[in-house]
Every structure is written in C-alpha cells, then in structure tokens.
Design a protein with these regions (language model features):
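Long, highly charged, low-complexity intrinsically disordered interaction regions
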Residues: 4, 56, 63-80, 90, ...
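Short, ordered loop/turn segments at secondary-structure junctions
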Residues: 38-40, 129, 240, 323, ...
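Duplex nucleic acid-engaging cores and interfaces of nucleic-acid transaction enzymes
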Residues: 50-53, 60, 64-320, 326-412, ...
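Structured, non-catalytic alpha/beta "coupling" segments that mediate domain-domain communication
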Residues: 74, 88, 98-102, 227-240, ...
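A glycine-rich phosphate-binding loop feature that marks nucleotide/adenosyl-phosphate handling sites
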Residues: 178-185, 321-325, 379-384, 403-410, ...
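Short beta-alpha junctions and helix-cap segments that line functional grooves
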Residues: 318-320, 330, 386-389, 520-523, ...
C-alpha cells in the first residue's frame, strides 16, 4: 500500500501521510461520508470528492497490479520472462504501456504473420530487415518450396512477418499514438440509404461532420456514437496528416534504397494501414468515449445532487394532485408525516368537465384534512389544474406548488410502491409521490432509480457500472449531509446512511415497528446485526428528535459526547443549557479540549453544531408562478420575457420549464454577459430564472432562450 500511497499522493499533489491515513480508514470499513465528516484530523480535512478520488485511484492501481501478475505468469509459462523484462513490467504503472510490453508475447489467433512463420519464412523476413543489398531474387528462391508457390508468395509472407514486428514495436506504437494525440480528427458520415430514415433526422448535424477529436465536446461525441450504434452514422478517427505517420515509421525501419529496403517499406505501410492505425484508432475511440462518459456522469451526478438537495416544505399537511384530462385529477390527502389519509378523483377539465363539483370537493378536502399546501404534478393538464386550484376560495391561505413528476410513474409501478400501497392503483401511488416530493424531495427521490429522474445527458449511452457508482455515491452523500430521522425514515432512505445498507435498514424499521420509536442513539445497538463498527459509521448521521440527550438530535458523534459534557461541566451547566445559551458557548476555548485524537477541526465542527443542532443544510422553499398568458408553444413569441425553472443542465447549456409541454434551451453562450465554460457556475437545478425568448421553432418544437441582459 505504501507504493500506491506515494503514487496517488504525487498524482493528486497531497502529502503522502494524508493519503495513507485515508486508505487505512477505507480498508478498515469506513465510508466516505464518515471519513469526511468525522476523521478530519487523519485526512487533513479532505472532502468527499478527494476521498473518492483516492479510493478510485487505489482500485485502479490494484487492478493494474493484478494485470501485471497475470502478464508475468503468462510470459513465464512461455519461457520468455527475462530479468530485464520482469523489471520493466514491475516498474510499469501505465496500462497502455503495459499492454505494449505484453503485445509480442500475447497469445494470438492465427495471423498472417503466424501462417508465414509456419511456412518457414521467418529467416527471409530477418534477412530483408538487414537491408544489405540487391541479391533479392537469388535469395528468395531458397524459400520457394512446400506451401510457398513462388517468389512473390515468399515475399508476401516475409512482409507479413515484418508488418507484425512493426506493429508490436513499442516505439512505433508510441509514434503513431503521438500523431493521433496531436492530430486526431473524428469524422462522421451518414450511412448510404439512411438519409431519409425517420430515426436519422436527429443526427442531421452529423451527416457530414468533421472536428479535431480534442475539441469534440462530450455531448457531441456521445451523440455521434449513438448514431453509429443505431446504424445511421459511419464514424472514424484518423490523424489529419497520415503521410506523417508513415514517414515516421519509414524513418525508423527503412534504411537505404535497395530491393530489400523497398520490401521493408511496403511492409511498414501495410503495418500502418492494416494493424497500427486500426489498433490506435480503437484505442483513441475508447479513450475519448471514456472521457465523454466521465464528463456526462459528472454532469448527471451534479444535477442529481441539486435535485436531491432541493428545498423541502417540511412536515406539513399536503394535498397532492396528479393532473389529467380524460382520466381526471387524482387527489390524495397526506398528514404531516406523509401518511395517506384519503384519495379520490375529480374532473375539473374536459371531457367530463365537472368544474363546480370538483371545486366544492377540493375546498371540502382542504378544510376536512386541514391542508396547508397543495402539490400539483407538472405533467399533462398541469397548467389548467394550477389555474383551477388557485381560483378556489379556501378557508385559509394555502400555498400552491408545481412539482416535477419525473420518475413518479416509474415509482408508482415499482415493487417499492406496491409494498407501500398494496391496495391502491398506480394513480394513487403517483399522486402520493408528488405530494411527498414537495414535503421532502430527498426522502421520496431515493425510492426511484436515479436514472429515471430525467436530469442526465445521454445517460443510457455511458458506462452503466460507472454511472451507477457515481449516482449511488451522490445519493449517499446527500442523505448523510442532511441527516436522517431514524423514527420516520423509510428503509430506502436508511439504506443510504453511512454504514447501514439494505439489511440493517430493514432491521431498523422492523425494530421500530415492534418496539416503538427509538429514544436514544444507544438503543440502535439493540437492532439485530448492528455491531460496533456499523454503529460507529451510522450514529452521527441518524437523528432522534425529542431524545433525552439533545446531542442525539445533532450531527455530534456519540464518540464526542464526553467532550461536550466536559465543556458543559467546565461552565457549570447542562448540555441542554449549553445548546440553548449562545453566551455560554462563546466562553468556550476549543484549544483547551485538543487531545491526541481530537483536534481543532473536529472541535470547530462540534461548536458549529451546538449552535443549531440537526440543522437542515437545504434552502427554504419558495412559491413560483409561471406566466399565466403562456399555455402552449403557440403562445410563445420572440422577445417575450418569461419566468422559468431550470430543470436540467448539460455541457451545452440548460433546459428551462416555462410551464408548457416544451422546455426552452439556454445555450451556454446565452447564459451570461460573459464567457461561460461550465453552465453549473451560473445556474443550478430548480433555480428560478427570468429569460427572454430569442427563437421559436414550432415545427421542431424548440424554444431558444437567453439570460443575457436579464
């Protein structure tokens, strides 16, 4: 591990001891949120992103180390592992370089070169490589026998052997790699006969496309690759000047100008076209795809984080509406804990159009269930339903919110929803999800596959394993940042708490159901399979409101309770008094409580937490209203200034909900009156923005927006 620690430290420009300590904690079973929050002294205050990067790099080095062992074992079994070769493999920590070293020894399917060797042509190839003279015809005749029919057959076989040697030459591969890295151009052409396909229309921009690979943005590259996968586009990656590639190879392998050197020259050109170029093109295609995947996953994870940390309404009685025309609007009433109290359908819109009756029912439900806020899904009939709701006269002031439905239909048909509401249909479950999403977006969204939430960029085209890891890590980070009420949380939410997972999460809910609410964090140790390690990892992130010890409802870890108790004792007060009295807290000198294991970073966190125990880091929710005059894309006119909500962020800009079916696009160049390279520095998911319409394409259902000058 020491060697890996040093390599990671060098790559990330971090002191090696911080990397070593982080790796020890990770290998000891500590989670990233726990290390980031409660082990700052060990890591020097590394954040979750840095800890995750250390973990990722360690896993890659471990994988590479195993690959090296496999390669050495294979070469040794061939009897070709020299001391020099072993040293080269041991000292290699670059995956591409390692495979280049291995290539000459790698078991191959039967190649043209191997077939030529079996015909006894290897000595001819070796003689040609000497490039000493012109007595070619006489020498070649010696090899015309057996399966070799004539001189040309012999020369062709010898050239095949030379071509393979050129292909397996490390320096040659690096030369071509260098040319690709400097000059690679990605080109796309429409497949002949596909121009008029309906599916091809969205790839029209790439029918005759060419761009330097290093300048090709991730969203363009993923779009091109999707077009290729669908059989619409033919894609290639080549250096802009291929002559320079062959010239470099000729300078390396061809000497003089005689009959032999001309044969070598021909073999070198064949090696480039048939072997080297396709291999390096495949390599660069994979590398560029991996880079595009990483960028798309980064954007998706960032969007998901903002969505999960959206402002919650909190524990209030909510009426949720899943709007619709023909099937009506499904209405549910929820108590402050999100429990379903009532459901029914109303029909305020055509074709039934029971407007007055629907209004009376709605007013009665608001009064009967003492509703404090109404959540309306943003799908079909959303604007009409919002207008219907806001036109009613309630007996109290009711806040009305439009809530994203993305993923609600998937949740309503899921096993999770069926287990939760076995006696209700999908429409009721969907309306409940909409209402709960207003109360606590994080608690509700964790029940839905993150890929279904609709804030990704080509999420189905990227590496699915890496995507799942990134999204799971994002959910885990958000859940632990906010903290979880152990007495109300679902098993889905508890699953993402540091140190728990599905089994312990279910055990906690089962214990709670059987024994009533938890009264202290220590009681968690009575949960089946809750060991000391799991308790250490989860305790600080679980909250117990109204606990006897107020610290149980804070982010102060139980291991630090003695420190807080000592602070209170030194001030001759109780822990409750210390939390309630700012003047008492101001008299604390954190330096006084520093020990070998607890430093100022932890003490600073403790004092901040005592100011507002269990505080929610999410912002306060705000009511938003769309322009009442805009109901469809036909109402949108160039020059209009409209309110909107950012719903998705990509590399090329962001999409904005204007309260109609079609989302508007603010291109990255229109986000601000300055150059913007990263849209996330200007906008965030759910941000309320004011935009101006700069283009409407009703045929293609596209709306172009700007924030410049707004």
């Amino acid at each position: 591990m020491e060697q890996f620690s040093q390599m990671i430290a060098d790559a990330l420009k971090l002191p090696v001891h911080r990397v070593e300590n982080t790796l020890k904690l990770l290998q000891g079973g500590a989670t990233i949120p726990f290390i980031s929050r409660y082990r700052k002294e060990a890591t020097g205050g590394l954040d979750e992103v840095q800890i995750s990067e250390i973990s990722s790099r360690y896993e890659k080095l471990l994988e590479l180390s195993k690959r090296k062992e496999t390669i050495q074992s294979t070469i040794e079994s061939l009897g070709k592992l020299t001391d020099d070769l072993r040293r080269r493999i041991d000292g290699c920590w670059d995956a591409t370089e390692l495979e280049d070293i291995y290539l000459p020894y790698k078991p191959k399917r039967k190649t043209r070169a191997e077939a030529a060797r079996q015909k006894g042509l290897e000595p001819l190839a070796a003689w040609l490589m000497l490039q000493r003279g012109n007595a070619l015809d006489a020498y070649v005749k010696n090899f015309v026998k057996g399966e070799v029919k004539n001189e040309e057959d012999a020369l062709k076989g010898a050239r095949d052997i030379i071509a393979e040697q050129v292909n397996e030459d490390e320096q040659a591969r690096n030369q071509i790699r260098h040319q690709f890295s400097r000059q690679a151009v990605i080109s796309a052409k429409v497949v002949k006969g596909k121009e008029t396909d309906e599916a091809a229309a969205k790839y029209r921009d790439y029918f005759d496309f060419s761009e330097p690979l290093k300048r090709c943005s991730s969203h363009r590259l993923l779009a091109i690759r999707r077009g290729e996968a669908e059989g619409i586009l033919k894609v290639s990656i080549t250096p802009s000047d291929e002559t320079e590639c062959t010239d470099r190879l000729e300078r390396r392998f061809v000497r003089g100008n005689n009959e032999c050197s001309r044969q070598v020259c021909e073999a070198v050109n064949d090696a480039y076209k048939r072997l080297l170029k396709p291999a390096i093109e495949t390599e660069f295609a994979a590398l560029s795809k991996e880079k595009a995947d990483d960028e798309a996953i980064r954007v998706f994870a960032g969007n998901l984080r903002q969505l999960l940390l959206a402002p919650p309404l909190g524990q209030k009685r909510v009426l949720g509406i899943d709007p619709g025309f023909r099937t009506g609007c499904k209405v549910v009433c929820l108590d402050a804990q999100g429990t379903l109290l009532h459901n029914e359908a109303i029909y305020p819109h055509p074709p039934k159009y029971e407007y007055q009756l629907a209004g009376r029912k709605l007013v009665k439900l608001v009064e009967q269930y003492r509703i404090e806020a109404i959540a309306i899904g943003n799908g079909t009939a959303s604007r009409e339903t919002e207008q219907f709701v806001t036109s009613q006269r309630f007996d109290r002031e009711i806040q009305v919110f439009v809530v994203s439905e993305d993923g609600a239909s998937i949740y309503s048909a899921s096993k999770t929803a069926r287990d939760e509401f076995p006696d209700y249909d999908v429409t009721v479950r969907g309306a409940v999800s909409i209402g709960r999403r207003l109360m606590d977006p994080l608690a509700e969204l964790v029940k839905i596959d993150a890929k279904s939430i609709g804030v990704g960029q080509y999420q189905h085209d990227v590496d699915q394993t890496k995507l799942k890891e990134a999204l799971d890590q994002t959910v885990e980070s958000c859940v632990n940042l906010v903290g979880v009420n152990v007495n109300t949380a679902s098993s889905h939410l508890l699953t993402y708490v540091s140190g728990l997972g599905p089994v312990l999460a279910k055990n906690i809910v089962d214990y709670r159901t059987a024994n009533g609410p938890f009264r202290s964090r220590r009681e968690l140790l009575k949960v089946p399979r809750m060991g000391a390690k799991a308790f250490e990892q989860c305790a600080g992130f679980l909250r117990i409101p109204h606990a006897e010890n107020p610290l149980d409802n804070s982010a102060v870890h139980p291991e630090s309770y003695p420190i807080v108790e000592r602070m209170a004792a030194d001030l001759h007060c109780s822990v409750s008094d210390l939390i309630a009295n700012r003047e008492l807290r101001s008299r604390i000198s954190p330096e006084k409580y520093v020990t070998d294991t607890v430093g100022l970073p932890t003490l600073t966190d403790i004092l901040q937490e005592l100011e507002k125990p269990g505080r929610d880091p999410r912002q306060k929710i705000q009511v938003f209203e769309f322009d009442k005059n805009v109901r469809t894309i036909d109402d949108v006119q160039e020059g209009m200034e409209l309110p909107g909500i950012v719903t998705n962020i990509t590399n090329f800009g962001c999409f904005v909900d204007l309260g109609i079916k079609e989302k508007g696009l603010i291109h990255v160049s229109q986000l601000a009156d300055r150059f913007v390279s990263d849209p996330t520095t200007v906008v965030s998911i759910h941000q309320h923005v004011r935009v101006r319409v700069i283009g409407v394409d009703r045929e293609r259902k596209r709306i172009a927006l700007t924030m410049k000058g707004m």
